Amino acid sequence: MEGGRDLIYISSDLHLNHDKPFIYTARGYSSVEEMNKDLITKFNNTVTDEDEVYILGDLCLGGADSLIDNFKMLSQLNGNIHIILGNHDTETRRKMYEALPQVVSISYAETIHYRKYHFYLSHYPTLTANLDDDKPLRARTINLCGHSHVTDPFADWGKGCIYHCEVDAHNGFPISLDTIIEDMKRRVQEDEARYAKQLAALKKCFDEPFTKVNTIIQIQPIANCDKCISTPGYDCPGVQNPFYDRCPEGHKYQRDPPDGGYYS
């Protein structure tokens, strides 16, 4: 409980009983048994039985002979569990999930509205995430996902409003929606500061030449071209635009700036 209310947690890709070194060694474990035990401990040290938990797929692996062992491990998990199916969640495993007493729902995707924020939960990263970066965070659709086993929750941030919830990205722990919101607000603020700095640098690059061009235009208007100036009473249209190489009549004209000046 925090502030007198139950929390909502998100996790993904536990891969319990996935007896492949590229999974458990990448997470810093010496064996799949060590990984299983540690992930369950971290889960239950974070989540209470009163909390809601969304697991975004790939809870466990292993052959048919591992079903009973997987059922026993998953039965230990705290919370009211909502499962979003992943690519390793076969029909056989889905039936096993349905038999777990703490599982509340099983689906392929879910939408959550929380603290005026809008979340789309899926196993895979999805372009459902709103790409309007200029909108406030509360006006965007935030995609919470897993699948990729990245260690950076913002690994797909440049593709949209996407936040990774794999245990790989959170040191094995489930993460609360409140923490996700604060994490994303911090990232948005960092992006805005970085964009402002880049814009200031870009503006500085252009300010000097633009100022010089404006000064040149003010102190030395472009003269009429040779042909137009020789026609009495005719004002060459080229005088109005110093960036033309030729006047609208097609006549080339002289546009040398003062010493030290230049046109862009």
State what each model feature region is.
Residues 1-6:
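Short, Lys/Arg-enriched N-terminal segments with co-localized hydrophobic residues
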Residues 99-194:
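Conserved beta-sheet core of the metallophosphoesterase superfamily
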Residues 202-264:
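Cysteine-centered metal-binding/redox modules
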Residues 45, 134-136, 220:
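Structural motif
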Residues 48, 138-139, 223:
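Structured loop/turn residues at beta-strand edges in well-structured enzyme cores
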Residues 10-12, 54-58, 82-87, 121-122, ...:
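Active-site neighborhood of phospho(di)ester-bond hydrolases with catalytic His/Asp-centered motifs
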Residues 11, 16-110, 206:
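Core catalytic region of metal-dependent phosphoesterases/phosphodiesterases
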